[in-house]
Amino acid sequence: EVIHFLLSNCKFWLEEYKFDGFRFDLTKGFTQNKSNESTASNKDDSRIVILKDYYKTVNTTNPNAVMILEHFCNLDEESELAKAGMKLWHNMNESYCQSGMGESSNSDFSYMRNSGMPAEGWVNFMESHDEERVAYKQTAFGNLQNAGLDIRMKQLGTNAAFFLTVPGPKMIWQFGELGYDYSIMYKYDGTMGTEKNTDAKPVKWDYLTDQYRKGLYDTYSTLLKLRNDNPDLFSDNAFKDWKVSVSNWDKGRYLRLESTTKKLVVVGNFKNEQINTGVYFGNTGDWYELNGETLNVTNSSEQPVVIPANSFKLYTNFPVNN
């Protein structure tokens, strides 16, 4: 009866209120099998059947509706659910907090992708209602504690360049595009608690009036427009290579996408000093930066490029209309 009640409500909301879809909380609990904290993430075939039934109802009612699961189970189960059409939350908070703070340890981005998971299966996120804000951690820990807002926002822009260019769905948590830096432990009365809480946090529309936060906002906007204008370049088949592990910190991180006719290269510097590096482009000729400047590539396998501190450069083999 409970399942029937929930499914009938989902159908009603989709038809009557035109919902775009649903995000179900802690779906590893959608089972009749007993488990504990250490076993709940193990593959549960009965849970897979239940969730597929839910998705069938949603998909039959509206084929375009999205069903997102906060699942956090083993890859074999998540992969099967993703192949059925569902999307699963994927937590990248630690990696992007570390890079956002200018700390190389535990900052590997490569966990965003897995050969056993469809590219559209994981909804990667840097922040959520359960996780600490990257911009807050910049002010409290790491190598940017004493940096100015201009530098911190540039670092967050470099984070975004290695987040939004990766094929697959992404979640941007509220005001992350403006560098929201109130802690998850901030309380409604204006004091700082000692634990995560869901108290209402200040709504900071005034961030848009700050030139550095607006600059971060514009970076997000530009990257998202690039994705929307060039879906072929951000499909899973277009993903060619990236070097985003801890060992790639000192010489700059790198990502390359390539569709039938379009190419994109991102190079990022998360350090507090300029780096000079050699970049693989794949072909010589003119490449275009997001700011409209042109780079004439003469060495396709190791073109010298200078990346300022806390910055990124994104190149395409076609002019980008911003």
Mark where each language-model region is.
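Extended catalytic-interface subdomain
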Residues: 129-131
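Aromatic-anchored helix/helix-loop segment that forms the rim or "lid"
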Residues: 137-160
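Solvent-exposed beta-strand/loop surfaces of large extracellular or lumenal domains
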Residues: 289-302
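Active-site groove signature of glycoside hydrolases
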Residues: 7-37
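C-terminal beta-strand-rich structural cap/linker in extracellular carbohydrate-active enzymes
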Residues: 299-322
